[in-house]
């Protein structure tokens, strides 16, 4: 079974600081361009019993317990480094280009500049490499559903495909879904070192707080690499 190890390398520690600042600052992944506006509430995450949870429950611990269901065994070898160019989630009808996301001056993670693109955090591995690759997108934009509006409705076993600059495609299978108050973001589970190629999809969730201009939660989808397709010749 894939393991999320407790050790952290230098890159993971830097990323953890960044995302912790993001969660504490409350900048989120959807409020950009939506300040003080009413917006549609996305569907809640389909959290399995015993899984990563924070929705309609007592405050989630910093490092929630793993799902009681076994995660899918990675069946593909890790891939070489190659920048992601697009993402496809067949079960949601999602197809989106991918842009780069770095860190802002305040050490919080940048967010996509529109509601149609997905961002890859450049401080994380590329999809298919060893470790957790992090992709983020808005849940709403200008009061309308955006790329990851239905991310919380994903189920274990569904697939996510990421095309890469070298023409290859990394195929991931969802192993867990969690929804957390932004003040309880599971930094270690999302950014911590793992012994296989993994993917994390992040957006906002829960109700929209008109006073702060933000949704109150984060939704995280955890997935493992199960297949890779070579570039077409």
Regions found by a protein language model. Name each.
Residues 29-154, 164-166, 176-233:
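Solvent-exposed, non-transmembrane regions of membrane-associated and secreted proteins
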Residues 1-14, 38-42, 55:
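Terminal targeting segments of Actinobacterial cell-envelope proteins
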Residues 17-30:
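Hydrophobic membrane-insertion alpha-helices, especially the h-region
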